[in-house]
């Protein structure tokens, strides 16, 4: 193996002699990003070489293991390069290299939330780090680390939806507010099928929570909710015009509450008299 020296070395190696670290957290690479990087490399060259270490048997180098820069290495492969400049880290131990790979990618690469969560988990379980220590090493708040780790409580199906970009981190946080795994799966499906925004997903989640335990056959789309809200506003206005007081209608699941805003007991007496004189509300509203 190369003798330890104080500085790293930039060398040119065969592109096929490089292997990805088993601790590389990134699993998804955008083809669009790779094509943009290829265009940049063809225009100005590879500005920041990947970082590698030697994997040896005795004095013979078997291959070079990536510590950082897999995306650049992949782009060079796709561009048809046969060799690539790399920064060689000298005499770096297995544990140090693995930890460095995880931390380097967390800090520098735009990881998917699931990739980030899995990277944090490996730092904790493989290297025995606490959440506080992980947060310190990667330059993030402890609460951020904890929130990412919570994503791993989601089912593999929902994790895959997040990994593939079908839902966002915001959507995943909303799904986590549901304790029932079946409701989580249902909300995930609705978000994907209806292309819901996070705020719309929150409304559906509240409805699912309120109706938990009952038979739920159909969930409203955002258009349904908008139309329902408009109907409530129209009914509120008609009731207000009839009785002379401000009326507010609130719905929660299949239940609804009608509130009359009164100033004093005299208003209450007048409202009682009005209700008595108008018979059923359905007759008054028709």
UniProtKB/Swiss-Prot annotation:
<dbReference type="Pfam" id="PF02195">
    <property type="entry name" value="ParBc"/>
</dbReference>
<keyword id="KW-0238">DNA-binding</keyword>
<dbReference type="InterPro" id="IPR003115">
    <property type="entry name" value="ParB/Sulfiredoxin_dom"/>
</dbReference>
<dbReference type="InterPro" id="IPR041468">
    <property type="entry name" value="HTH_ParB/Spo0J"/>
</dbReference>
<dbReference type="InterPro" id="IPR004437">
    <property type="entry name" value="ParB/RepB/Spo0J"/>
</dbReference>
<dbReference type="Pfam" id="PF17762">
    <property type="entry name" value="HTH_ParB"/>
</dbReference>
<dbReference type="GO" id="GO:0007059">
    <property type="term" value="P:chromosome segregation"/>
</dbReference>
<dbReference type="GO" id="GO:0045881">
    <property type="term" value="P:positive regulation of sporulation resulting in formation of a cellular spore"/>
</dbReference>
<protein>
    <recommendedName>
        <fullName>Probable chromosome-partitioning protein ParB</fullName>
    </recommendedName>
</protein>
<dbReference type="GO" id="GO:0003677">
    <property type="term" value="F:DNA binding"/>
</dbReference>
<comment type="function">
    <text>Involved in chromosome partition. Localize to both poles of the predivisional cell following completion of DNA replication. Binds to the DNA origin of replication.</text>
</comment>
<dbReference type="InterPro" id="IPR036086">
    <property type="entry name" value="ParB/Sulfiredoxin_sf"/>
</dbReference>
<keyword id="KW-0159">Chromosome partition</keyword>
<comment type="similarity">
    <text>Belongs to the ParB family.</text>
</comment>
<dbReference type="InterPro" id="IPR050336">
    <property type="entry name" value="Chromosome_partition/occlusion"/>
</dbReference>
<dbReference type="GO" id="GO:0005694">
    <property type="term" value="C:chromosome"/>
</dbReference>
């Amino acid at each position: 193996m190369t003798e330890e020296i104080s500085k790293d070395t930039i060398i040119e190696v065969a592109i096929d002699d490089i292997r990805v670290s088993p601790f590389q957290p990134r699993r998804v690479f955008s083809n669009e990003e790779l094509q943009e990087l290829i265009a940049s490399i063809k225009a100005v060259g590879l500005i920041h070489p990947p970082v590698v270490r030697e994997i040896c048997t005795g004095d013979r180098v078997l291959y070079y293991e990536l510590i950082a820069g897999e995306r650049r290495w992949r782009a060079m492969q796709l561009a048809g390069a046969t060799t690539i400049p790399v920064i060689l880290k000298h005499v770096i131990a297995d544990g140090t290299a693995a930890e460095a790979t995880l931390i380097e990618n967390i800090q520098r690469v735009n990881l998917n939330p699931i990739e980030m969560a899995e990277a944090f988990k490996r730092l904790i379980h493989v290297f025995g780090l606490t959440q506080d220590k992980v947060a310190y090493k990667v330059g993030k708040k402890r609460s951020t680390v904890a929130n990412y780790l919570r994503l791993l409580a989601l089912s593999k199906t929902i994790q895959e939806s997040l990994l593939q970009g079908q839902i966002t981190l915001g959507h995943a946080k909303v799904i986590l507010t549901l304790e029932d795994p079946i409701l989580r799966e249902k909300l995930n499906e609705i978000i994907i099928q209806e292309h819901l925004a996070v705020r719309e997903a929150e409304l559906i989640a509240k409805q699912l929570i309120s109706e938990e335990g009952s038979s739920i056959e159909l969930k409203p789309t955002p258009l349904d909710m908008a139309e329902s809200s408009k109907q409530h506003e129209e009914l509120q206005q008609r009731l207000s015009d009839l009785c002379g007081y401000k009326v507010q209608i609130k719905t929660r699941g299949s239940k609804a509450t009608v509130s009359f805003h009164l100033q004093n007991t005299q208003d209450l007496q007048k409202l009682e008299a009005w209700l008595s004189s108008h018979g059923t509300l359905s007759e008054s509203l028709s």
